[in-house]
Amino acid sequence: MGSLSNYALLQLTLTAFLTILVQPQHLLAPVFRTLSILTNQSNCWLCEHLDNAEQPELVFVPASASTWWTYSGQWMYERVWYPQAEVQNHSTSSYRKVTWHWEASMEAQGLSFAQVRLLEGNFSLCVENKNGSGPFLGNIPKQYCNQILWFDSTDGTFMPSIDVTNESRNDDDDTSVCLGTRQCSWFAGCTNRTWNSSAVPLIGLPNTQDYKWVDRNSGLTWSGNDTCLYSCQNQTKGLLYQLFRNLFCSYGLTEAHGKWRCADASITNDKGHDGHRTPTWWLTGSNLTLSVNNSGLFFLCGNGVYKGFPPKWSGRCGLGYLVPSLTRYLTLNASQITNLRSFIHKVTPHRCTQGDTDNPPLYCNPKDNSTIRALFPSLGTYDLEKAILNISKAMEQEFSATKQTLEAHQSKVSSLASASRKDHVLDIPTTQRQTACGTVGKQCCLYINYSEEIKSNIQRLHEASENLKNVPLLDWQGIFAKVGDWFRSWGYVLLIVLFCLFIFVLIYVRVFRKSRRSLNSQPLNLALSPQQSAQLLVSETSCQVSNRAMKGLTTHQYDTSLL
């Protein structure tokens, strides 16, 4: 039972550790990365405005007028078929017949999924329907529309508003719409025509009864009170033509223009859910919904953002793209980021020195030297000093690696402020890893880094830490240096000197006695050459003669004295 509880505790500990170790990205990080790629931004701060609920503020970027003719939408239907789950009858071992239920799509209901307060410039073209009996989507104020096409429900034609310069720029139903414009030049021209907010206006002659409007991109013309929008050659595939069909069929004007019908071949080829063929009766009038799903395009009507036009809709709408309200900063002062908790202190400039990074206490078993160190406390001081020095060098390398990147984006590292408890807690590395956003006013800021500076510094830090282990265990310099550990006090010096002197005296006495005894016990053997031997023999003979003479002289003198 105890082992089982220990195992459960280990699992909980590992789970908690992994939870702390793995830091999820901020929810806005993927959006910021996508926008930075589209706009070719790197090594900068992207900030997005947040409201009180921390929801991102959206900006609507108007599309060019040519988008109405170059892009085609998708047909959807007011009701969508959904098959119910099949239920098996266990008594008969058979399945019930598949039943279907109907659901109205969000587009068909005319429901918006977002609200917009900012526009990036004006719309080059707005489309208006005044007399629709279906959902009211909202009206874009006329001052934000360079040109307006409104649908005439009496004859089923689009009519251009030729007197936009003389008519009132404000309608009664525009007072509830609050829109503002801004210019973000760093967005324009950076998206390969994905976000092209330059206006392509229609050219008109507003002072004549018979007027003619020409669009330079598509060649569509309006002449007098009639329009060839539905009959112009090669102009029956664009979004504007599909919108005309969406409105025309909603008013039941199928017989107004001869042979043209709402339920033509191009629509009957569409299929419903799960490849089920669409019944023909869906296509007769009010069940068509024009959608721009999965295209990146949206419709803005008033403040509401829509993905499609429901049948019989009314309002004044424009076409464009939906993006977060972003602000770009090349650098951010530390005082601008109000929710930084950590403090970064200045680090001593790095000195380019070469040296070992081994820490002997990590590799030498301290148990082997515990007894000796108890007798001689100073033993091992060199190892400790070297370890402390190497740790200091490693810390200096780490600070130097991060300092270069941080100083490039932080001009005043000494002015970092602490965050209040209500704000998100973060520091510069978490902001750059995009795990938390830095608060600048009411904006959420993330750092966009595509030069891989931070990752390269992290790699260098990893290599520096690995160098602490990749060192030779045998260091001759360290061996000689360890001798210095014995000379940490004069007491040890005197003890070592006396000990060495005593050993020297013992060795000297023993060696001297042994050498003297050897000299006395060994005979003298001389090695002489023949000449030296002859000379020595002559000398010996002379000495014998001399000795004999002296002996005889002595005997003679002795005899004389006796007489």
UniProtKB/Swiss-Prot annotation:
Transmembrane segments: 489-509
Tissue spec: Expressed at high level in the placenta and stem cells (at protein level). Also expressed in the kidney but at a lower level. Endogenous retroviral envelope protein HEMO, secreted form: Present in the blood of pregnant women (at protein level).
Keyword Transmembrane in record: yes
PTM description: N-glycosylated.
GO cellular component: extracellular region; plasma membrane
Signal peptide from the UniProt entry: 1-26
Glycosylation sites: N122, N192
Keyword set, alphabetical order: Cell membrane, ERV, Glycoprotein, Membrane, Secreted, Signal, Transmembrane, Transmembrane helix, Transposable element
Family, as annotated: Belongs to the gamma type-C retroviral envelope protein family.
Function comment: Endogenous envelope proteins originate from retroviral envelope proteins, which mediate receptor recognition and membrane fusion during early infection. Endogenous envelope proteins may have kept, lost or modified their original function during evolution.
Protein name: Endogenous retroviral envelope protein HEMO
Gene name, Swiss-Prot/TrEMBL: ERVMER34-1
